[in-house]
Amino acid sequence: MAERVSSGDRAVDVSIVLPIYNERGHLRQELDRITLAMDSSPYSYELVVVDDGSTDGSLDELRQIDGIRLISFVHNRGSGSARRAGTRASTGRVVVWTDVDMTYPNDDIPQLVKELEGHDQVVGARTSEEGTHKFARVPAKWFIRRLAMYLTGVRIPDLNSGFRAFRRNVAKQYLHMLPPGFSCVTTITMCFLANGYSVKYVPIEYHERAGESKFHWYRDTRRYLQQVVRMIFMYNPMRVFGPLSLVLLGTGFVKLVWDIVDKSQFRVPVNTALLLFTGFQVLSIGLLADVMSRSGRQSQDQEPATR
């Protein structure tokens, strides 16, 4: 039988981090569901609940619940800030991220933790899209996911699922990079993949959320895209600078040959020279950025999981 720890005085197997923002109507139901599942598992665990400045009485409700570790923000700071604070306060060898809005199969958390064996992160890949603003979210998420796959060179079935488990000792070196909003889940996925850590995907059912969605389709989609581009420049800048420099150098070389053949004399026009010079400049910047990126990662000493 599992043991739940609420004091944070000693380490546990699993820390479940729950960001809360105006979820009073279904808060207890979700916490009861998680508790029932974990009590039936072999894992000792803790519930780290972060109230993100709720205004509907969620914090008052949480203060009446025994057996949880509660962190509360005075003002709303965003899902990423809540997850970061909860993860930093965690003591578990494994950290689970999920939501309490009835969308994720929280009774499957023990199975999610079990799937982590031999991997550094396990992500619940949603098999359907039940979120709001589908007309905008579906194509935007497809494009951003393809961009992330280009960076990492790895197939990513679901880039921004909020249902995941990971090794805390690996994740802690990237917590400072998490943005305050929803794109924190994208960031933690790409940080693991870009640095050679193993990420496994398991299919999950995804349900319509209870209560009001906090996702703003334009603002949060823009932030997702910005975060992916930021990750590209931080971890694999040659993915951008390499192709761009090749296009410039290739175009410049073809034009140089054409100029020589067309005019029967070796004289480099200004526009041709500009193409070649710009191509070399872009390539040089890319190589320098790549060296800096690799140097910055040498201090990371957490070994990937082994089978």
Predicted regions and their residues:
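Donor nucleotide-sugar binding loop of glycosyltransferases
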Residues: 23-27, 54, 105
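Short beta-strand/loop segment that forms part of the nucleotide-sugar
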Residues: 35, 43-53, 71-73
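Structural signature of beta-strand start/N-cap positions in the alpha/beta core
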Residues: 15, 44-46, 69, 120
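Short, well-formed alpha-helical segments that are part of the catalytic scaffolds
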Residues: 23-38
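Acceptor/aglycone-binding surface of glycosyltransferases and processive sugar-polymer synthases
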Residues: 71-89, 94, 106-182, 186, ...
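A conserved acidic beta->alpha catalytic loop
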Residues: 51-59, 102
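Hydrophobic helical membrane-anchoring modules
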Residues: 1-12, 183-307
